From Swiss-Prot:
Top-level taxonomic group: Eukaryota
Name of the featured protein: Anther-specific protein MZm3-3
Main location: secreted
Keywords on record: Disulfide bond, Secreted, Signal
Species this chain originates from: Zea mays (Maize)
């Protein structure tokens, strides 16, 4: 994933902001976990997503010219604990948000 400048619906530029972007993404993931399925499934998925905190530093694009760090064992373990249903449901919710906010879709290469 690379950091790029995108144009918001109002024509303004949206700049990535490093750690705040990653924190926002993590918060979004946790919130998204609570938006679908039964209460038990929501709690399970939310817990799995909260467990991804050790991955936060690996989810921020590096500065130009820097090499992204390899994820540590705590991150890899936490990522392995996220169920497919939880991950796919969260990605689906996140992908639907721009349209719900009258923003252009996010396209990643």
């Amino acid at each position: 994933m690379t950091a790029t400048t995108t144009t918001a619906a109002g024509g303004g530029k949206v700049q990535p902001r490093g750690l705040p972007v990653a924190l926002s993404l993590l918060l979004l993931l946790v919130l998204a976990a609570g938006l679908g399925g039964g209460a038990e499934a929501q709690q399970t998925c939310a817990g799995q997503l909260r467990g991804l905190a050790p991955c936060l530093r690996y989810s921020v694009p590096p500065l130009p010219g820097q090499v992204p760090p390899a994820p540590g064992p705590e991150c890899c373990s936490a990522l392995g604990a996220v169920s497919r249903d939880c991950a796919c449901g969260t990605f689906s919710i996140i992908n639907s948000l721009p349209a719900k906010c009258a923003l252009p879709p996010v396209s990643c290469q």
